[in-house]
Structure formats: C-alpha cells, structure tokens
Amino acid sequence: MNYFELFGLVEGFELDTRQLAETYRQLQTQFHPDRFATAPEWEQLAAVQRAAQINDAFTTLKAPLRRAEYLLSLRGTELRGEQQTLQDTAFLMQQLEWRERLADLKGETDPERAIKDFRQEIRHDHQLLMQQLTQALATGEDPRAADCVRKLKFVDKLLEELERFEDSLFES
C-alpha cells in the first residue's frame, strides 16, 4: 500500500502537513479497532492491522527524513538499514571537524555559549542540506537525494549528541 495514496496526497517530498494530520484523524476514527469490538474476529484483526498501517504511514510521512527515505524506496533506492558510507571527502572532513569541536566543548570557558554557537552552525548546515534534498527529490536526482539523507542522518545524530552533552553539563 502506498502511504501517499492512503492519505490522498500527491506523491512527493513536499506535502501539506495539515492535510496529512486531518486525514490521519479521519482514518483513525474510521478504522479504530474499538469500532469493530462486536464484529467477527477476522474483521477485528483486519481493523487492528489497518490501524497499524495507518500509524506507520503517518509516522513515515510526517517526518521529513523518513518521508524522503520512503519516497526514494518507491523509486527503487533503498536506504533503510544500509551500511553504505559517504564518498564525499569534504563532508567526511566536516564530520571530523564537528567531532573534534564537540570533544573540545568540555574545555570551553563558557560552554553554554559555545554549545549555542555550535548548535546554530549545525542547524544552519542542516537547513542547507534540507534545501538540497528538496531540490534533488523534485528534480529526480535520487543518488544526490540519497546522499543528502545520509548526511542529514549524521547531522541529526550530531545534534542529539550535542543535546546529551549539554544535559550532562547541567547534571554535574
């Protein structure tokens, strides 16, 4: 089942999130397992399965990276669970610099300010990568879009690590 079709959306990266949420609520109401409590067992099971599909579809489509991965999979490029590394030397160097900078935050005299500045820089790069991803998907440049997804996953993990580091500063 195509998630875009399930929600009555045009297949593409950019979508109307309000329409997605509204259709989700309608589908949840229509296929909620409680509505089938007095139905035969096979119908109850079908309702539970349909509700799970609706939830999976919504979770996938509402998150931009998951939506991009799903869209690429519909086009024949599977990214989930892959172990492929990036061949972009400049981005690999950027990763090393970011990792080094994250490690150096511990020695900063004003770690709160350093974290804020670092987060702002990473978010800016994230925004640029999202723009590149949007353009690549719109123009059918799937290999380029796949690379953007890989890079964005790294950036998201880095932001999570930065959050954990910041939390650890305030726990001490």
Curated annotation (Swiss-Prot):
Chaperone in keyword set: yes
Pfam families named in the record: HSCB_C (PF07743)
Key words of the record: Chaperone
Chaperone as UniProt keyword: yes
A single cellular component GO annotation: iron-sulfur cluster transfer complex
Origin superkingdom: Bacteria
SUPFAM superfamilies, per the entry: Chaperone J-domain, HSC20 (HSCB), C-terminal oligomerisation domain
Role this protein plays: Co-chaperone involved in the maturation of iron-sulfur cluster-containing proteins. Seems to help targeting proteins to be folded toward HscA.
PANTHER family in the cross-refs: IRON-SULFUR CLUSTER CO-CHAPERONE PROTEIN HSCB
Full protein name: Co-chaperone protein HscB homolog
Organism: Aeromonas hydrophila subsp. hydrophila (strain ATCC 7966 / DSM 30187 / BCRC 13018 / CCUG 14551 / JCM 1027 / KCTC 2358 / NCIMB 9240 / NCTC 8049)
Name of encoding gene: hscB
